Amino acid sequence: LAQYVYPRYFSIDAGEVVAMDMWLTNARLNGTHQEGLWDIDVRSEQINGRLKWMEGAGNTADGKLVARLKSLNILQSSMKKVSDMTGREDIYRIPSLDIVTDDLTLFGKHLGRTEIVANNVSFKNGREWRINRLKITNPDAALESSGSWVTTAGNRQQTRLSYVLNIKDAGKLLARFGYEDIIRRGRGEMKGDISWDGLPFALDIPSLSGKLSLRVETGQFLKADPGAAKLLSVISLQSLPRRLNLDFRDIFSKGFAFDEITANAGIANGIMRTENLKMNGVNATVMMDGSVDIRQESQDLHVVVIPEINAAAASIAYGFINPAIGIGTFLAQMFLREPLMKQFTHEYHVTGSWSDPVIVEVKAGTGK
């Protein structure tokens, strides 16, 4: 009977067709099926390229999909079918993948060239969909990542990723994701490890945990709507000029230009903590420590602003890159070497929500 169910050669030309759980429009498929290997050429609005499906020995997880695509457009609606699988026994039965796409569009965002190599691995109490390589490249950045999606007994799921993001233009990268006019230029690197409960494509903020390090050079925060990229509006300190009559208010209200931003941070259950975020600019040096609650969109930060520091103080500020050195240690060193700098140093305690922060100036050198 199998030879009647599975054709050796086929050609499909249809306005709409469902293939591999994806709804394809204006589709043309030509392919062959021989000895467990499907070889298909696909032309549609969603997929354009060559697919090879190697059947497994009894279940989907044993199979392998190899694809070389000119373009792939994944819509948000197409993910609903995957989400609906989360309560089913075969959630972890995803095949091995070897996919290269010249132009990936994900949920309306153009990501660029994408490569993914992954395979399904079983262990005593569950299964792991292991991401051996995930690489995304476009003119603005290059991401290299690896990790896993683990399902254990009781259908508990967790996604884990290690990543390195090489940033060529931070402003254009943010614009690619819909956050325009937030930053101008900016080159650098962000790397770290993150994990969250649930599916790889459904970031769960309450369980988000991990660590990151950041270094970005030569850019400028623009005067942007705080509603866009809210977390960046916290870091850029655009709320300070609106609430305090500062001598250096123009530094932030017109957009802080920076030579370098460095930071190390840890994330636990959606709360990010740092002891050494530093921004060096021509007109000021800014340092922060404290926590940001990504879940509640709130913060508890100690902020230090040193406008137009002199050469001696600048040498100390530029040396403030050691993750082991906190703001308190830096200020103690600076005030010891340059006592007059205490008069020009402004410290603030910033709490409340991202959209309506509470800012209180504190005595320099005390943090309170």
Where are these regions (language model features)?
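C-terminal low-complexity, glycine/proline- and small-hydrophobic-enriched intrinsically disordered tails
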Residues: 347-353, 358-361
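Short, compositionally biased segments
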Residues: 122-123
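Small-residue helix/turn framework positions
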Residues: 6-23, 30, 39-84, 88-110, ...
